[in-house]
From Swiss-Prot:
Protein's gene: DGK7
UniProt source species: Arabidopsis thaliana
Domain DAGKc: 90-248
pH sensitivity of activity: Optimum pH is 6.8.
Protein name as annotated: Diacylglycerol kinase 7
EC number: 2.7.1.107
């Protein structure tokens, strides 16, 4: 399972498949976002753009009222079939924007004002005031109610509406998760989502060609961004459900994205486990779009998050954050402490077994955990850690030798790779070498069992937590593909 040098390849694109962007494509998007191509934007007229995006006023008011009342079934009579309704035409590309004012530093409030100028006030939602699930349930529900009563304009807006999210990867995932409820309810016409990057890593934004950072010349760039959002093709994105099952009675402080199940569950007693399978288990479940990891990288992230929460004055910007993060990596032993000095710092195979299901296979298969690996990452996107590509662009001969296929974010497979000591991780993140390729899988089951380790450190899409372990009972982490795919707008 040797590392392999990277090979450079051009990405292919289609109207419906999210292909891996090449470095050239990503750089071009970043240049556009930073205003280098703004001379080409002169032809985008502000009023013409507004006409393509803005829904009729009566629909905007009806949606606003339904969201405020949290009821999409009762709509004021004067909004049902207003005078002249036949003359109201649906815009070419009805759109709403969710903005996280806590992202992007000082840009949040002024960006909200700028978007309201380009669209309408009612079509820009502040996430501190209107949550995504409220819009999905009551805003889209309002359009469904009006359409069911014969309002053709409402029906067309509901079918064509697109969503832009101004925030980081966590905010985008939040919106995608709420839209997933439409799939569960059997609804059609799921709105696709585009991104205005306001976060730190912005890997979802990079993966769909929306750039890796908030544009420098942002006021003029917003016209171009919204225009691209009206024209962009639709791509698909896999998402993955994670279930963490531990012995009943264990106490864990999970991240926001991981929710406890209502009832205790009984685990399959036929599981091939090193430790005993508890008769009853407490379970938490959630969904991730980018990555899940176990090991030293999660431990460093956990310590950094706690330090930042306890002493926020230390983390005043991205440069300071990176310095603190690097220092914390060293004090935790990833760089500066030999792996053999402390049992708690040894390879993950001392506490872990991994089983996978390959594509079109119903049987679990155990895979080898390399002894040198101190972090294991399960990656869905091509981009990781602010645009790095740890899986790499692998040559066809290597793919054939390992039994791999070229990785895509919509192929129903997920990549598993390992990071060794901190220096190895640094070379991987610098894209000098690829990570330790372990497997591609359609489903994964981790078994964690204590001993010298009392806790394991896990993280999901950047949210870390400390997972208690027992030596007599196993803790299981199971990852399976969500049966439906999210829809994304390509920014190219």
């Amino acid at each position: 399972m040797e590392e392999t040098p990277r090979s450079v390849g051009e990405a292919s694109t289609t109207n419906f498949v999210a292909a891996r962007p090449s470095a050239k494509t990503d750089d071009a998007v970043t240049m556009r976002g930073c205003g280098f191509a703004n001379l080409a934007l002169v032809g985008i007229d502000k009023e013409e753009l507004r006409g393509r995006l803005a829904m009729p006023e009566y629909l905007r008011i009806a949606m606003r009222d339904c969201i405020k009342r949290k009821d999409s079934t009762e709509i004021s009579d004067h909004l049902l079939l207003p005078g002249g309704a036949a003359a109201d035409m649906a815009p070419h590309a009805p759109m709403v924007v969710f903005i996280n004012p806590k992202s992007g530093g000082r840009h949040g409030p002024v960006l909200k004002e700028r978007l309201q100028q380009l669209m309408t006030e009612e079509q820009v939602f502040d996430l501190t005031e209107v949550k995504p699930h409220e819009f999905v349930r009551y805003g889209l529900g309002c359009l469904d109610t009006l359409a069911a009563k014969g309002d053709e304009c409402a029906r067309e807006c509901r079918e064509k509406i697109r969503i832009m999210v101004a925030g980081g990867d966590g905010t985008v995932g939040w919106v995608l998760g709420c839209l997933g409820e439409l799939h569960k309810d059997g609804k059609s016409h799921i709105p696709p989502v585009g991104v205005i990057p306001l976060g730190t890593g912005n890997d979802l934004s990079r993966s769909f060609s929306w750039g890796g950072s908030f544009p420098f010349a942002w006021r003029s760039a917003m016209k171009r961004t919204l225009h691209r959002a009206t024209l962009g093709s639709i791509a698909r994105l896999d998402s993955w459900k994670i279930v963490v099952s531990m012995p009943s009675g264990e106490v864990v402080d999970p991240p926001y994205s991981l929710k406890p199940t209502i009832e205790e569950t009984a685990l399959d007693q036929a599981l091939d486990a090193d430790g005993d399978v508890p008769p009853k288990a407490k379970s938490y479940e959630g969904v991730f779009y980018n990555y899940f990891s176990i090991g030293m990288d999660a431990q460093v992230a956990y310590g950094f998050h706690h330090l930042r929460n306890e002493k926020p004055y230390l983390a005043q910007g991205p440069v300071t954050n990176k310095i603190i993060y690097s220092s914390y990596s060293c004090t935790q032993g990833w760089f500066c402490t030999p792996c053999v000095n402390n049992p708690a710092l040894r390879g993950l195979r001392n506490i872990m077994k991994i089983h996978i299901k390959k594509a079109n296979c119903s049987e679990w298969e155990e895979i080898h955990v390399p002894k040198s690996v101190r972090s294991i990452v399960v990656l869905n996107l091509y981009n990781y850690g602010s645009g790095r590509h740890p899986w790499g662009n692998l040559r066809p001969k290597y793919l054939e030798k390992r039994g791999f296929v070229e990785a895509h974010c919509d192929d129903g497979l997920i990549e598993i790779f390992g990071l060794k000591q901190g220096w190895h991780a640094s070379f991987v993140m610098a894209e000098i070498i690829s990570a330790k390729h372990i497997a591609q899988a359609a489903a994964i089951r981790f078994e964690l069992r204590g001993g010298d380790w009392k806790n394991a450190f896990l993280q999901m899409d950047g949210e870390p937590w400390k997972q208690p372990m027992k030596s007599d009972y196993s803790t299981f982490v199971e990852i399976k593909k969500v049966p439906f795919q999210s829809l994304m707008i390509n920014g190219e």
